[in-house]
């Protein structure tokens, strides 16, 4: 590239479109489906695949030992995600095909249904419209590694495998209290979920196979088979402790099911940090820039650099800087655009802080084509902000910063010569806080995917939170809960 020419500016629209529409992932999933299903007409198959628009529907296996809560979790997930609930029994009972009749004949003879036949049955059921459009939650299957491998050979692979886990003694106690409603097959428990309706209570019966000895045998079989199943799905499985309140278990299950696997798509971080003064935005931005090589763009710093470099825009904004006045938004945006559209920012990504401070500035940034793909709000109470800033002093001799509580001066001599930045006086800090709070709620509405992080903790703990959300895809949005009629 000719270094004597004007600096290369890359318009962000192309990469932004590809990322927003998930172009890379769409193509990757289509190629995967074509290779697995091997249709006779790949072009028409891909057109149909795009028409289905079902890449993000849930495809989940829920496994676990007896009485671990598989049925409860599957029902809650299906209700929350509007997915189809499947079990081996429901697949057999609702199917009238020749395959189902063949499988039922094995059961009538007291024989095990062959794994290959199970795979064909599942493939047939999952190809129906409700599973394609809404997704599916398969409970209690596969039970062995052989069944899991047969499912893989049939092209059935879950996006998430939930494995519920609890101590055997807890599971045995749970199982012995299980009761079944003969009217509708609903499961209740003598301790944890006893119905209040006397009619339902009269319908409850003790199911077969829940004695301590029988449960122990089923647990032995489960523990023998589950390691092989986990080896079959090493990257999509997660164990969740089921020995806790069921809503806590469900919260963890739902969080996992909504998570997305790490994408192989090219990812250029465009990170926006905002928060009250003293929340640590500058420190977090510098840590991100240092570790990942992205461009650290501090609004206040680039304005001062423009003045110091005596650029044309720098000369225009110099009076505002010298008089401690707010620089007009259009001038700020012009200077930021030079940095945000640079070759380095376009190829390595950027982290921006200090702008925008309100929705008008956020709209200007969006109209200019600079849309962050991660937005973090560093939350801090006013008392902590005032404590952090108003007690911070600087040694004019060494330039070292000290804090009356967290980092006191090493000697009385140093303490006596410490000076406070005028901007850190309690009165001015409170004024900046008032300005921040006046706009914070509207900024949260402007960026609906904003991730709130508690900044009142160790800065490296805060960085770990930011890092985890930056390197991994954002979770799927949670569907709206169905409204009762």
UniProtKB/Swiss-Prot annotation:
Q: Which Gene Ontology molecular function entries are recorded, alphabetically?
A: (d)CMP kinase activity; adenylate kinase activity; ATP binding; nucleoside diphosphate kinase activity
Task: Kindly list the positions annotated as binding ATP 2.
Answer: 278-283
Sequence segments annotated as region (Adenylate kinase 2): 269-472
Q: Which InterPro entries match?
A: Adenylat/UMP-CMP_kin, P-loop_NTPase
List its EC numbers: 2.7.4.3, 2.7.4.6
- Which parts of this chain are annotated as the region LID 2? 391-424
Binding positions (ATP 1): 67-72
The segment annotated NMP 2 runs over: 298-327
**Primary location class:** cytoplasm
Report the locations given in the UniProt record.
Cytoplasm, Cytosol
Q: Which residues bind AMP 2?
A: 325-327, 354-357, 361, 432
Give positions of region: NMP 1.
87-113
Q: Which reaction does it catalyse?
A: AMP + ATP = 2 ADP; a 2'-deoxyribonucleoside 5'-diphosphate + ATP = a 2'-deoxyribonucleoside 5'-triphosphate + ADP; a ribonucleoside 5'-diphosphate + ATP = a ribonucleoside 5'-triphosphate + ADP
Enzyme class per UniProt: transferase
Which residues make up the binding site for AMP 1? 140-143, 147, 218
* Superkingdom as given in the UniProt entry: Eukaryota
Q: What does this chain do? A: Nucleoside monophosphate (NMP) kinase that catalyzes the reversible transfer of the terminal phosphate group between nucleoside triphosphates and monophosphates. Has highest activity toward AMP, and weaker activity toward dAMP, CMP and dCMP. Also displays broad nucleoside diphosphate kinase activity.
The protein, known as? Adenylate kinase 8
Q: Which organism is it from?
A: Xenopus tropicalis (Western clawed frog)
Q: Which gene encodes it?
A: ak8
């Amino acid at each position: 590239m000719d270094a004597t020419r004007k600096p290369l500016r890359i318009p962000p629209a192309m990469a932004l479109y590809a990322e927003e529409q998930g172009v890379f992932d769409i193509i990757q999933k289509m190629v995967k489906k074509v290779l697995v299903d091997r249709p006779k007409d790949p072009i028409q198959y891909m057109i149909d695949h795009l028409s289905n628009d079902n890449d993000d529907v849930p495809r989940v296996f829920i496994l676990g030992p007896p009485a671990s809560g598989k049925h409860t979790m599957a029902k809650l997930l299906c209700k929350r995600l509007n997915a189809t609930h499947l079990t081996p029994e429901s697949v057999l009972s609702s199917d009238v095909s020749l395959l189902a009749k063949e499988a039922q004949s094995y059961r009538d003879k007291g024989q095990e249904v062959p794994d290959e036949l199970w795979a064909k049955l599942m493939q047939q059921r999952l190809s129906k419209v409700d599973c394609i459009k809404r997704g599916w939650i398969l409970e209690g299957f596969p039970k062995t590694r052989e069944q899991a491998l047969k499912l893989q050979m049939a092209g059935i692979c879950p996006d998430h495998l939930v494995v519920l886990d609890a101590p055997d003694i807890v599971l045995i106690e749970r199982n012995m209290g299980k009761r079944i409603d003969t009217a509708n097959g609903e499961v209740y428990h003598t301790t944890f979920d006893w119905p209040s309706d006397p009619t339902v209570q009269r319908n409850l019966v003790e199911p077969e196979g829940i004695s301590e000895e029988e449960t122990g045998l089923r647990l032995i079989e489960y523990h023998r088979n589950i390691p092989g199943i986990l080896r079959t799905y090493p990257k999509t499985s997660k164990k969740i402790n089921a020995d806790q309140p069921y809503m806590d278990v469900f919260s963890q299950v739902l969080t996992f099911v909504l998570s997305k696997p790490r994408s192989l798509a090219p990812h250029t971080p465009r990170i926006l940090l905002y928060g009250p003064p003293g929340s640590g935005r500058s420190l977090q931005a510098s840590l991100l820039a240092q570790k990942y090589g992205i461009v650290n763009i501090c609004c206040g710093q680039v304005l001062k650099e423009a003045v110091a470099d005596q650029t044309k825009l720098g000369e225009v904004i110099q009076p505002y800087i010298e008089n401690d006045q707010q620089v007009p938004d259009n001038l700020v945006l012009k200077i930021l655009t030079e940095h945000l559209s640079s070759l380095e920012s376009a190829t390595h990504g950027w982290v921006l802080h200090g702008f925008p401070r309100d929705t008008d500035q956020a709209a200007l940034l969006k109209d200019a084509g600079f849309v962050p793909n991660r937005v973090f709000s560093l939350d801090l109470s006013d008392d902590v902000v005032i404590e952090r800033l108003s007690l911070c002093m600087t040694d004019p001799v060494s330039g070292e910063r000290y804090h009356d509580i967290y980092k006191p001066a090493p000697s009385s001599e140093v303490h006596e010569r410490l000076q406070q930045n005028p901007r850190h006086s309690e009165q001015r800090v409170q004024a900046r806080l008032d300005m921040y709070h006046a706009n914070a709620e509207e900024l949260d509405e402007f960026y609906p995917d904003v991730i709130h992080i508690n900044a009142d903790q160790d800065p490296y703990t805060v960085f770990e939170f930011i890092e985890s959300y930056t390197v991994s895809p954002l979770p799927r949005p949670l569907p709206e809960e169905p409204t009762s009629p």
